[in-house]
Amino acid sequence: GCCSLPPCAANNPDYC
């Protein structure tokens, strides 16, 4: 998922 991918997690702090 997004939160396991560092760039995605970094871009979605509220979600992750």
From Swiss-Prot:
UniProt-annotated stretches for the region Ser-Xaa-Pro motif, crucial for potent interaction with nAChR: 4-6
Subcellular location: Secreted
Modified residues (Cysteine amide): C16
Principal cellular location given in the protein's record: secreted
Site (Important for inhibitory potency on alpha-3-beta-2/CHRNA3-CHRNB2 nAChR): A10
Any GO MF annotation of the entry: acetylcholine receptor inhibitor activity
Tissue specificity comment: Expressed by the venom duct.
GO cellular component terms given for this protein: extracellular region; host cell postsynaptic membrane
Additional remarks: The replacement of Ala-10 by a norleucine (A10Nle) produces the more potent analog on alpha-7/CHRNA7 (IC(50)=4.3 nM) and on alpha-3-beta-2/CHRNA3-CHRNB2 (IC(50)=0.7 nM).
Domain notes per entry: The cysteine framework is I (CC-C-C). Alpha4/7 pattern.
Protein known as: Alpha-conotoxin PnIA
UniProt source species: Conus pennaceus (Feathered cone)
